[in-house]
Regions:
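AlphaC helix of the eukaryotic protein kinase fold
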Residues: 51-73
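Protein kinase catalytic-loop region centered on the HRD/HxD motif
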Residues: 133-143
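Activation segment signature within eukaryotic-like protein kinase domains
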Residues: 127-128
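Activation-segment/catalytic-loop signature of the eukaryotic protein kinase fold
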Residues: 85
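Conserved short submotifs of the Hanks-type protein kinase catalytic core
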Residues: 89-103
């Protein structure tokens, strides 16, 4: 795929040091965020810098490098990694890990729109376990995040949840007298401009858990937030597990700082306990091997075959799209030739699309109802996981039950077949396991038998998974010690988090 138009790079040029810039993903009051790739490793990265008009000595410029330092010092796999930082054309920049998936706020919002349901409680608890693990690591290195919220929990079906955006984070020693953050997830003391410490992150995590489960912030207005007599508006608990969850989250949302949990270590264990009780325990029971090229995960059949995808019988066909939406090569060209130029015209009318996005158009004269244009890769750089998640959510939003998909990004963008299959199938598995999806069949259609066999092998591994352990290994018997029935045997389940 070609690089993004120069206009989207906002004067940064084609590259910063070893990073080739694709284009701008978004911007805030003082900062801009770009998608790029390492020129040698071909891995996607996120580059954050300040807007061109912001002076190099400004608060915003200082924060970019401060964010890089704070992220880099936190030793946790649950924190988005800082990979590089420095100055470029008198502008500070931060290079950070790209998480190939969507954030929890988008996942929750789109499920509610498409399916009329939010996230299952087990998933909320697992996400919060990861968030608390990240925050605990931050606190143990003296860092207070100060902006914990669903949109800062970045989820990859392959690697799990990571906490990101440390843009207003501060060290414990300097976290004082500054009102910054997102009001809906901000504790009262932070809103008042008082000194804040890790207790602010305990509140932020509680507000995030509340929002992920119930689709709204715990307080509807600033007045409610500041009123010490106003409690979070929990709906009636539907189960003992949910009552347990509400008790835990309620303690995190205590307006009196002294009554909140002192840290997130015990909170993390409680989330682990709830998630462990509720999660479908053994994913092997949800996987059915139908035949060599057909599997079933829960109620969704996944079938893989060779052939021409343009003739697929499906409600929607996914196209491996480029960011400018032209359909002149690969699967896109085949769909345009069979379905008509109207498909390309509709896609291009929406303008260039960012990597990882997915856009729906009509299907022209194809048998399907829609074509879903998944912008999944660029020059060996894969965003296939994020694009697949959005394609699946879009299919649910459109009410589709059957999809036909190619191997995304493996053509002009040169993503390997294994990389593609892993990203697509882990995204599909998560989509199905979360529950509620309308999808009942996904047909993977490839041209070449050799490629199909490679894809099939990875797909089975991803869809089958390794299951949860049926037993707990508590260690080998001690040598030369007589086993006695009155001896103590204890497994401390509080020390085992969700897998």
């Amino acid at each position: 795929m070609a690089a993004a138009p120069q206009s989207t790079r906002a004067g940064l040029g084609d590259r910063i040091h070893n990073y080739e810039i694709w284009g701008r993903l978004g911007e805030g009051g003082m900062s801009q965020v770009f998608l790029a790739k390492h020129s040698v490793l071909c891995i996607p990265v996120i580059i954050k810098t300040v807007r061109p008009e912001i002076g190099v000595d400004s608060t915003g410029a200082h924060r970019v490098l401060q964010e890089a330092k704070l992220m880099a010092r936190i030793p946790s796999p649950r924190v988005v990694r800082a990979l590089d930082a420095g100055m470029h054309q008198d502008r500070p920049f931060l290079v950070q890990e790209y998480v190939d998936g969507i954030d929890c706020a988008e996942l929750d919002r789109r499920r509610r729109t498409a399916l009329g349901v939010g996230l299952p409680l087990w998933f909320v608890c697992e996400a919060m376990y990861a968030a608390c693990e990240a925050l605990t690591a931050a606190h143990q290195t003296g860092v207070v995040h100060r902006d914990v919220k669903p949109s800062n929990l970045f989820g990859s079906p392959q690697t799990g949840i990571r906490l990101g955006d440390f843009g207003i984070a501060m060290t414990q020693a300097h976290a004082a007298h500054e009102v910054s953050g997102t009001i809906r997830f901000m504790p009262p003391e932070q809103l008042r401009g008082a000194d804040v410490d890790r207790a602010a992150d305990v509140w932020g995590a509680g507000a995030t858990a509340f929002a992920l489960r119930y689709g709204r912030a715990p307080f509807g207005s600033v007045a409610e937030l500041l009123d010490f007599d106003k409690l979070p508006a929990f709906p009636p608990a539907r189960s003992p597990a949910e009552a347990y969850f509400q008790e835990l989250v309620g303690s995190m949302l205590e307006k009196d700082v002294a009554r909140r949990p002192e840290n997130l270590v015990d909170v993390m264990r409680h989330f682990a306990a709830i998630g462990g009780m509720l999660r479908p325990r053994n994913r092997r029971t949800q996987f059915v091997y139908v035949d060599r090229y057909t599997f079933q995960v829960d109620d969704c059949v996944v079938h893989m075959r060779t052939g021409d995808i343009v003739g697929a019988e499906a409600d929607a066909i996914v196209s491996s799209a480029n960011h400018h939406m032209k359909m002149r090569t690969g699967v896109g060209e085949a769909l345009r030739k069979r379905g008509g130029d109207v498909i390309e015209d509709e896609a291009m009318a929406a303008g260039p699309q960012p990597l990882g996005s997915c856009l729906a158009t009509s299907a022209g004269s194809l048998a399907a109802r829609n074509v879903l244009h998944a912008v999944s890769a660029w020059n060996e750089t894969s965003c296939v996981g994020r694009a697949t998640q959005r394609a699946l959510l879009l299919a649910d939003e459109l009410g589709h039950k059957r999809l036909a998909v190619p191997a995304l990004g493996t053509g002009a963008a040169r993503v390997t077949m294994e990389t593609c299959a892993s990203a697509m199938m882990t995204a599909l598995k998560l989509h199905v396991v979360l529950g509620g999806t309308r999808l009942r069949r996904v047909d993977v259609v490839l041209w070449d038998q050799k490629d199909l066999d490679v894809y099939r092998e990875v797909a089975e591994e991803c869809l089958r998974g390794d299951g949860d352990a049926a037993t707990v290994d508590i260690g080998l018997p001690a040598e030369e010690v007589e086993a006695r029935p009155e001896a103590a045997t204890c497994i401390d389940a509080s020390k085992t988090g969700p897998r």
